[in-house]
């Protein structure tokens, strides 16, 4: 496109962005303009206006998911834009690695702001979604939650896995993985859980490097562990915080006693929604918002009000689990890239069906529950899977008939250890030959323990020194000007910079100078 037409396009783009119409329908709806029941596709967003006031908006997730599938930027150098976005992703992935001020600065620098310079509400309100757990919007609310990744009870250290980056065809979306280490001094035993792999689904503002939407799917072991670690908070603990924070125009209860009456019901309420979520009518959800109200009462007091909290409701009942069989459970649809969480009914172990209708698979002896790898079991008159080693029940009649009811989860493979089958996540190992890189890069990887993590009983497939990435489930990449070369000293293939060496033959001078006690040296001139 010529400079003249580019100039015209950029002028149109600027004017359209000012009116916020160029890239499809504006998904934002002022809460005061919406009347009646709130449909599930509308997500509450608390916007901090220029004067400091809080304004509630509903964000139409359907508009975002359908109106932004094609985002051309004819006058933008796509290579430069992608490089700038990648630079932002590397910094964004690591914002929890430093102090809380660094987190706030990262949100101010990289995430879309609540308002534009002229004071109008941004069409692209920032969304941070932790799949199956909670949604935080807009910028200030998301930043507030991110601060919890760096406090006295938890600390996260993360880095982008550069070879995992997958740019999507819509010109604004990228999917990538980060390697995260969790330090949790606030939980029993003060566990250190290293080497989890979390997946991010990020949308940028069209034609820019501003992060609009960030959807994170946590490693399944993280979700399971945190759900189990979540305690049930007493009604008095919740109401003490509400009494302190929600006063004046933010008051939501007539008295402390009325708060106790309501929260006592919440504490004793058994939610059908998945445990560990902050989008359920649970004491955990109310406690989180009551605690957060101490800093942001305008935002969080509304979430602890009785009966019509915008967030602490059993949303799973309207998002797929409203008609489950009594022998089914509600599960989050893993891998969802939707702003609005999706759930489904799933028959419990020992039953088959579609979740809304579940039929028992009865037995009186184990031989009546055949399964591959001999992992079927008969307990209390129902077929199931032996506990341990990761095999899960698949509630499908055809699968049961083909003796495959006990299977590994997605992204796991069956491996054998001491004559016993086990489900092993791809990228984990007990031996090098189990690594996905082994077929072509056997000498470039090791099967080694990565940090500390009592939840992961396996070693990890790690690339040798110098490679661009850690390894896990991806091939080891060695970018120029580095080169892959065999090291006699290390008995493996390394990725060395031009002046690095471990053996004399690595150098044009045939002289590798290595300091005493070291194995890596530099080539002499």
Swiss-Prot record:
Places the protein is found: Secreted
UniProt domain EGF-like: residue ranges: 317-359
Cross-referenced InterPro entries: EGF-like_dom
Entry keyword annotation includes Glycoprotein: yes
Alphabetical keyword list: Disulfide bond, EGF-like domain, Glycoprotein, Secreted, Signal
Disulfide bonds: 321-330, 324-345, 347-358
Signal peptide stretch: 1-24
One GO location term (cellular component): extracellular region
Gene3D superfamilies tied to this protein: Laminin
Location, primary (coarse class): secreted
Record carries keyword Transferase: no
Annotated glycan sites: 60, 77, 171, 181, 268, 281, 354, 411
Protein name: Putative EGF-like domain-containing protein R659
Taxonomic source organism: Acanthamoeba polyphaga mimivirus
Lineage: Viruses, Varidnaviria, Bamfordvirae, Nucleocytoviricota, Megaviricetes
């Amino acid at each position: 496109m010529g400079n003249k037409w580019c100039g015209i396009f950029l002028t149109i783009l600027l004017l359209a962005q000012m009116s916020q119409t160029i890239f499809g329908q504006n998904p934002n709806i002022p809460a005061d303009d919406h009347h009646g029941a709130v449909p599930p596709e509308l997500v509450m967003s608390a916007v901090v206006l220029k004067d400091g006031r809080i304004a509630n908006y509903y964000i139409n997730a359907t508009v975002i998911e359908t109106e932004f599938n094609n985002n051309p930027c004819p006058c933008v150098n796509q290579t430069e834009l992608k490089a700038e976005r990648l630079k932002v992703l590397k910094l964004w992935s690591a914002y929890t690695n430093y102090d809380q001020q660094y987190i706030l600065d990262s949100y101010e620098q990289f995430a879309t702001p609540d308002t534009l310079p002229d004071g109008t509400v941004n069409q692209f309100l920032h969304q941070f979604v932790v799949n199956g757990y909670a949604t935080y919007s807009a910028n200030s609310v998301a930043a507030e939650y991110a601060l919890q990744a760096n406090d006295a009870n938890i600390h996260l250290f993360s880095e982008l896995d550069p070879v995992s980056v997958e740019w999507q065809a819509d010109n604004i979306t990228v999917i990538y993985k980060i390697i995260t280490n969790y330090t949790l001094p606030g939980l029993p035993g003060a566990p250190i859980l290293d080497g989890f792999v979390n997946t991010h689904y990020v949308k940028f503002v069209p034609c820019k490097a501003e992060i609009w939407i960030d959807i994170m799917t946590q490693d399944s072991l993280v979700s399971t562990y945190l759900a189990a670690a979540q305690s049930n908070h007493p009604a008095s603990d919740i109401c003490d915080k509400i009494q302190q924070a929600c006063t004046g125009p933010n008051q939501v209860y007539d008295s402390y006693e009325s708060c106790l009456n309501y929260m006592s019901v919440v504490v004793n309420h058994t939610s059908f929604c998945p445990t560990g979520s902050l989008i359920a009518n649970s004491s955990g959800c109310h406690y989180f918002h009551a605690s957060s109200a101490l800093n942001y009462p305008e935002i969080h007091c509304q979430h602890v009000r009785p009966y019509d909290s915008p967030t602490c409701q059993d949303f799973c009942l309207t998002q797929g689990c409203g008609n489950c069989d009594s022998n089914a459970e509600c599960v989050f649809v893993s891998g969802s890239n939707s702003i609005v969480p999706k759930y489904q009914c799933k028959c419990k172990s020992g039953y088959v069906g579609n979740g809304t209708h579940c039929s028992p698979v009865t037995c009186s002896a184990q031989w009546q529950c055949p399964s591959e790898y001999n992992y079927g079991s008969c307990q209390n008159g129902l077929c199931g899977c032996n506990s341990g080693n990761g095999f899960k029940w698949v509630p499908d009649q055809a699968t049961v008939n083909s003796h495959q009811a006990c299977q590994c989860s997605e992204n796991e493979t069956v491996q054998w250890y001491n004559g016993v089958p086990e489900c092993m996540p791809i990228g984990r190992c007990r031996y090098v030959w189990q690594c996905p890189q082994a077929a072509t890069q056997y000498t470039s990887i090791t099967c080694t323990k990565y940090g500390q993590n009592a939840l992961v009983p396996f070693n990890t497939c790690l690339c040798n020194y110098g490679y661009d990435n850690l390894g896990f489930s991806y091939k080891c990449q060695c970018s120029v000007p580095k080169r892959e070369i065999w090291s006699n000293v290390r008995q493996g293939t390394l990725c060395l910079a031009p002046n690095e060496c471990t053996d004399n033959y690595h150098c044009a001078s045939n002289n590798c100078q290595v300091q005493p006690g070291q194995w890596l040296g530099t080539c002499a001139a």
